[in-house]
Amino acid sequence: MNTLFMHCRPGFEGEVCAEISEHAARLGVAGYAKGKPQSACAEFVCAEAEGAERLMAQLRFAQLIFPRQWARGSYIELPETDRISVLLEHLAALPVFGSLWLEVLDSNDGKELSTFCRKFEVPLRKALEKAGRLVDNASLPRLLLTFISGRRVFVGVAEANNSALWPMGIPRLKFPREAPSRSTLKLEEAWHQFIPREQWEQRLGDDMTGVDLGASPGGWTYQLVRRGMLVTAIDNGPMAESLMDTGLVQHLMADGFTWQPKQPVDWMVCDIVEKPARTTSLIETWLGEGLCREAVVNLKLPMKQRYAEVRRLLDRMEATFKARKLKVSIACKQLYHDREEVTCHLRRLDLKPRK
């Protein structure tokens, strides 16, 4: 159980290694990180047997930026036949589990294995239940089996309340046909990632106002409109007619980096292609001056030192708000629908409740 296994977007293995290594050093967990480029996974091999468990106990998964999913455990080799017996034998030393997820890597090889996993899950689930290794109890640890091939699997453990919301950290969101661009899924995923479902009515209500900076053609505006918000769309480019026809959108031809609302709004969202430092300044202005209560903003990443740059900008925001004596929660994640970017969620915690 001394290895921490993490899924990620292909090409971001180095960022996962840098991020987890920094946390491990801070927490005094000895070990080393490794990740093969484009493999869609990375691991932190701990020097001590309980190292991975310590890391997971002292970190909140939601605070990690680049890992999509994590689990502590080890690899085992499986025979061509009777894989279940070998797995049961290995699991005898582990706790009873409250749920089971079979996972594959987000790679071509992984996608080919997904059919095998679907077929294998039913008999495996039955065998685990019969052996008393799997019960229906959300408070118990989750068993995460990541198949590298039909013969090699990472047998992992994670707490259901401190790991990804979905298998492999990949949400099953359906692209709405009426949305003007696929980028709409980024904002929908952000709602799921950053706002507990039971708070949606309160924090994403139809009595709210929103601003979309760099809105054209309206992929993110669509999500705000879908929640029933009155939206001001800022962009010199055109907006989809279907959105304008709702009567909920006011389109202003202006620069998203200079325009400001006359009255504070509930939400500001922004997916402009710009250097991340400039976008960070925009965030600091909007949250710092109380122009919005909450914001979802994408930071486009540089080619090199991507984790270091994100960390620097997040630390800068935190220091800026602290210096102004403002209470702002800051979260950041590379979402499944993100590309060379990360998504930030910010919320003012010190404003009076809405009337």
Curated annotation (Swiss-Prot):
GO terms for biological process: methylation; rRNA processing. It comes from the Bacteria. Keywords: Cytoplasm, Methyltransferase, rRNA processing, S-adenosyl-L-methionine, Transferase. Its EC number is 2.1.1.186. Signal peptide: none annotated. It is found in: Cytoplasm. Its main location: cytoplasm. InterPro entries: RlmM_FDX, RlmM_THUMP-like, RNA_MeTrfase_FtsJ_dom, rRNA_MeTrfase_M, SAM-dependent_MTases_sf. S-adenosyl-L-methionine binds at S183, S216, P217, G218, G219, D235, D255, D271. One of its GO terms (cellular component) is cytoplasm. The active site is at K300. GO terms for molecular function: S-adenosylmethionine-dependent methyltransferase activity. Pfam families: FtsJ, RlmM_FDX, RLMM_N. Belongs to the class I-like SAM-binding methyltransferase superfamily. RNA methyltransferase RlmE family. RlmM subfamily. Monomer. PANTHER family: RIBOSOMAL RNA LARGE SUBUNIT METHYLTRANSFERASE M, RIBOSOMAL RNA METHYLTRANSFERASE FTSJ DOMAIN-CONTAINING PROTEIN. Catalyzes the 2'-O-methylation at nucleotide C2498 in 23S rRNA. This is Ribosomal RNA large subunit methyltransferase M. The gene is rlmM.
